[in-house]
């Protein structure tokens, strides 16, 4: 069976994601589509709108055959480390190709950019560091660095391109036998906050609309029925969706009771940012107001969100340094085709394939995952808190037969 990988967050799964899956299967002739998916906290440092289990069900209903989890130590990171963990997991489970969305859908631009970067890595990275030190954003610093080598083959101001570039670099750096492919994204931009197309919208705009209206009907045109049903069930069970504001009291407690020395141990706390965190936390009444007060050119909103997630989960620089590579493949769900594929590769997979969380106790990556799960569940009062926490430890991989797919 030919396995093809996708790297996803599905926050939530929408029609653009559905298009990506269909195009991926069609262009690659995949027998098995494998999604490596961030868990309860995401690459930009946000809590996922619903749990990884609810999002895995959305993915399986839409045609994904296997869903595996990207551990927190790689999921809540800048593009390079995020990509490093994700492509290694897909390679370990036997994916022959990786297919990602991009602005142009032309893989040649990514290959050309990666080749130039590999040949000029030291110079390129030095130029980026210089730009960042001057207070530039990463896209701006990268664009200026490319100009030193002639015209940039990629527009690195676009998030999909930044991630795609990181995926190709990670495949080459790790010498993985996995071919990268790309397809053009549809209509809505990654961060678009409004609806500009009758059926395609960004996950950002969907979450914003849900926050503003509270009505699932307001996003019905932009998501498959299975997504709507999972969102409905989740809110019915737990009473709410997740966003940063619900965690702000917990973050405030952590920052007010931590010393600056404590904060300097946390991953992402550099260049004296701990002073600004302590300076502004007492007076901020919302998470959004707090980040707006703390952010600088160097410390962007996204970077601060990741840092705050690390503060909540107590993810330290020492733990980050030790998290060099994934150590296991955690299975979240599978279709019948996925079950057959996993049976075929179980003995040949490069990492242990784990279905039960209890088997991972003691693994340093999973110990961090447990802390993230404890924080994520803190959005709810008891007895819902304990129920959500139990889901992390007791849930077996989801199985979806062909009949159940919508």
From Swiss-Prot:
Classification via InterPro entries? Rossmann-like_a/b/a_fold, tRNA(Met)_cyd_acetate_ligase
EC no. given is 6.3.4.-
Q: Name the species this protein comes from.
A: Geobacillus kaustophilus (strain HTA426)
What family does the entry list? Belongs to the TmcAL family.
* Top-tier EC class: ligase
Please explain the role this protein plays, according to its UniProt record. Answer: Catalyzes the formation of N(4)-acetylcytidine (ac(4)C) at the wobble position of elongator tRNA(Met), using acetate and ATP as substrates. First activates an acetate ion to form acetyladenylate (Ac-AMP) and then transfers the acetyl group to tRNA to form ac(4)C34.
Does tRNA-binding count among this protein's keywords?
Answer: yes
What Gene Ontology terms describe what this protein does at the molecular function level?
Answer: ATP binding; ligase activity, forming carbon-nitrogen bonds; tRNA binding
Q: Which UniProt keywords apply?
A: ATP-binding, Cytoplasm, Ligase, Nucleotide-binding, RNA-binding, tRNA processing, tRNA-binding
Pfam families, per this entry? HIGH_NTase1 (PF05636)
Q: Which residues bind ATP?
A: 7-20, 101, 160, 185
Which cysteine residues pair off into disulfide bonds?
none
Give a yes or no for keyword Zinc in this entry: no
Q: Which SUPFAM superfamilies match?
A: Nucleotidylyl transferase (SSF52374)
- Output the lineage of the source organism: Bacteria, Bacillati, Bacillota, Bacilli, Bacillales
According to its UniProt record, which reaction does this protein catalyse?
A: cytidine(34) in elongator tRNA(Met) + acetate + ATP = N(4)-acetylcytidine(34) in elongator tRNA(Met) + AMP + diphosphate
Which one GO biological process term can you cite for this protein? tRNA modification
* Name assigned to this protein: tRNA(Met) cytidine acetate ligase
């Amino acid at each position: 069976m030919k396995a093809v990988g996708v790297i996803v967050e599905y926050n939530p799964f929408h029609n653009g994601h559905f298009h990506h899956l269909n195009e991926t299967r069609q262009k690659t002739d995949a027998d098995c589509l494998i999604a490596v998916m961030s868990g309860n906290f995401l690459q930009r440092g946000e809590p996922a709108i619903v749990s990884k289990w609810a999002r895995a069900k959305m993915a399986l209903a839409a045609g994904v055959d296997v869903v595996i989890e990207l551990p927190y130590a790689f999921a809540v990171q800048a593009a390079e480390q995020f990509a490093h963990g994700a492509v290694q997991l897909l390679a370990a489970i036997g994916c022959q190709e990786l297919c990602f969305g991009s602005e142009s859908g032309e893989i040649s631009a990514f290959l050309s950019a990666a080749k130039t970067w590999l040949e000029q890595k030291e110079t390129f990275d030095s130029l980026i560091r210089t730009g960042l030190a001057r207070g530039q954003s990463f896209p701006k610093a990268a664009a200026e660095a490319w100009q030193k080598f002639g015209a940039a083959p990629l527009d690195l101001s676009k998030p999909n391109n930044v991630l795609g570039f990181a995926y190709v670099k990670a495949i080459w750096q790790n010498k993985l036998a996995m071919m990268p492919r790309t397809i053009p994204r549809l209509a809505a931009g990654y961060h678009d906050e409004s609806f500009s197309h009758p059926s395609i919208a960004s996950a950002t705009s969907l979450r914003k609309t849900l926050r503003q209206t509270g009505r699932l009907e307001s996003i019905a045109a932009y998501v498959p029925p299975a997504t709507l049903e999972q969102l409905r069930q989740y809110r019915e069970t737990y009473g709410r969706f997740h966003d940063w504001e619900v965690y702000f009291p917990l973050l405030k407690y952590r920052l007010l009771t931590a010393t600056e020395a404590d904060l300097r141990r946390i991953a992402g706390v550099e260049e004296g940012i701990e002073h600004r965190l302590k300076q502004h936390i007492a007076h901020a009444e919302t998470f959004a107001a707090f980040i707006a007060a703390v952010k600088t050119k160097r410390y962007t909103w996204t970077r601060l969100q990741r840092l705050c997630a690390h503060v909540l989960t107590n993810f330290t620089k020492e733990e980050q340094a030790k998290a060099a590579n994934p150590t296991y493949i955690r299975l979240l769900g599978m279709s019948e085709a996925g079950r057959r594929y996993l049976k075929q590769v179980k003995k040949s997979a490069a990492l242990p394939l784990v279905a039960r969380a209890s088997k991972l106790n003691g693994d340093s990556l999973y110990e961090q995952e447990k802390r993230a799960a404890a924080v994520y569940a803190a959005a709810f009062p008891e007895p819902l808190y304990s129920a959500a926490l139990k889901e992390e430890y007791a849930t077996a991989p989801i199985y979806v037969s062909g009949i159940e797919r919508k």
